Amino acid sequence: MRHTLLLPTLFLPIVLSAQYGTFDKKAVATAKGTATIILQDAGDSPYNRELMNAVKANWKFTNSTDFGIITDLVSAPMDPAKTYLMKLRRSDAEKHDATFLALVQGWKMKKGETLKVENNAVTNVPEGQEIASIMVDAKLLDNGGASMLNVYVKNLQDYLKQVETGKITDKTTADRLYASRNRLVKDMALWVAKDQLDNSLADLAAIQVIYKQPVKLMDYSQLMAAAAKGQPDVALADVVITGDYKTKWCFRRVFNASTGELMYLRDEPALFEKKMGFIDKDLRILEQSR
């Protein structure tokens, strides 16, 4: 008899956390032995094309992959022998909404249980089935930002590797690992798009007053070229803003463009159009990291 994999005590709720998942090595080992179904949007989109390219080029966690459409989940039950790479959407008690690219372990669904799909994202996957997740800006992925999927796909696998090897065992060890990578950004060229800066940082000169290491300020399309290429020795800035008005929140990350490793992570409220991107404190943390 096949048993459904559930991880309720080892999974961290992630609506306001940009990168976590299961902390259970056994869950990762089980997922590694599955076939992975890559669920694309209904209809053609930049997201679909780049996700397919990213998986074909960079997905190594499982040996077998196949492609499907997210809306197939409405009528077809999940398979406990498979994992699913899909978009999820969640809301928390404070009404913060966020979209995630997630690897989900299939399970034996109960009689009458169905999955809800809204705007190409599933809204009711049990939290215990999510193996790894990364917060994404779904609109940006279809409007010039799809190349970041190359980084996100590698990032999910890096997270799984850290759990599998025991380097991540809970939220504390995950945060400690991410913080330990801050200093490594200084050994690389930090690439930031102009649109990713808060208004309090006017230009490259304002950045260089605080951050003394190699840094480039560029158009977003240039940043995406590095993401698509997986350019070595480049640290890519990434910003996701969720919510609206009183619930607006800004997540700021830095990824290794080549490996997908998360090297910096910070988030806070972005009320009254303030802190809507990288701010001086982010640069100061990176500059002072040891």
Regions found by a protein language model. Give the residues of each.
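Surface-exposed beta-loop interaction hotspot
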Residues: 134-197
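A short, well-structured beta->alpha microelement
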Residues: 19-24, 60-80, 173-176, 207-231
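Start-of-domain marker
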Residues: 19-101, 108-109, 115
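Bacterial Sec-dependent N-terminal signal peptides
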Residues: 1-26
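Structural motif
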Residues: 39-44, 87-89, 191-197, 242-244
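Short, charged N-terminal beta->alpha structural module
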Residues: 42-61, 194-214
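Flexible, charged surface loops at secondary-structure boundaries
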Residues: 27-34, 77-80, 180-186, 226-233
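Amphipathic beta-strand/beta-sheet edge segments enriched in Tyr/Trp
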Residues: 88-154, 218-290
